[in-house]
Amino acid sequence: MHFIQPLQAFLQTKHIVEFSSIQQAVFKVWPRQNVVGIAETGSGKTFAYLLPALNQIDVTLNKPQAVVFVPTKELKWQILTILNDIKASFTGLKVSENFNSNAHLIVSLIGKDIILHETIKYVVFDEVDMFLEDSSQAEWINCVQLFQKHKPHFGFFSATLFNEQLQQIRKQVAPLTVVNQKKRAWKHSLVKHFLLNLNGQEPFAGLLALLNYHHNEQVLVFCSNAKSLKQLTSLLAHNQLSFKSLHGQLTPNERKHIFTSAANNTVRVLVVSDLLARGIDLPHFSVVISWDLPLVDSFYIHRSGRVARFNSWGNSYVFDLPHNQHKLTKFAHKGILFNSVHLERDGTLKFPQLKQSKQKPAVSSELKTAIKRIKAGYKKVKPNYKKRQKQQIAELFAKRKQRRSWKNF
């Protein structure tokens, strides 16, 4: 895809010179066609739909031209932050969360404040499977049908979209091109899953052991409901542990402040409800602990995906408790392999199946192709060719590391 000059300038500023598989595939069809984009968490779905839509914006037309619907305030703030950064290179671009503005691109929740503009030609639903849940499906259908009056192109994106949900989308929007870059819906190649055997001790003792073991890392602790979260935060406060909590009962300003602090690497332990399991990028976090398992099975994949963002490894822990066995059995049948961890009496952790060798960085298909291209350039053996070849490959990895925080989107 050829991007207009402002977007080229932005990509150059962020040192983005290659695109992920989902981005490359979506660029071929969106926004000329209705598209469903499915790819694992942290693969770059946001840029997959955002860059092509921005590429079509006419800044001389002071009317809304594209809208992105998201299911949570946190995801809305995250996308608006990205757009505000893009605006530095995109003179004249206006973005907003309000439909009563003349912004070119609107990022919004689904609600009563939606205003239909005939100039809106591109409509995206991010984390679309959340809109397809029973409690919000009717509102989503009404929203889609409202915008269909002016025949825009639709984009639907998620990390977990099953056949039944895909059929629900097809009933509302046709024709539809499906771009599926996730062949194994329940597995993420960069997440290591661990099952913590408490050996008769309390779950909180296990949590303390995990926090101690990962004392140099940032940790997300997920709770499935408000009662569970309140109980856990009380225990943490009673034990004088430093943490922040983020949940739906906070005011919007409180939620935004805590979310921004976590995104800016100033929070080590963040206790959250499942509202943060979807689409949120917290690049500094590398550990997820499920204090209890989510009510919706697929949310476990989204929880663990918070710490495996575009070629970075993540660890996800679950407690081996009787009331978790039913869901754990279902996860196992879906192909999730849990490594066994034991809580010792002295509060330490034993990893009998964990190799202590340093994990090798994951290599994307694009990077593999670039490495092959370098090696192919040395068909004739010349003095010091191995040294030069090794240096070129090292520079590739260095560039990837420099780009990683932005390629997460």
UniProtKB/Swiss-Prot annotation:
It catalyses: ATP + H2O = ADP + phosphate + H(+). Pfam families: DEAD, Helicase_C. InterPro entries: DEAD/DEAH_box_helicase_dom (IPR011545), Helicase_ATP-bd (IPR014001), Helicase_C-like (IPR001650), P-loop_NTPase (IPR027417). Belongs to the DEAD box helicase family. This is Probable ATP-dependent RNA helicase MG308 homolog. One of its GO terms (molecular function) is ATP binding. It comes from the Bacteria. ATP binds at A39, E40, T41, G42, S43, G44, K45, T46.
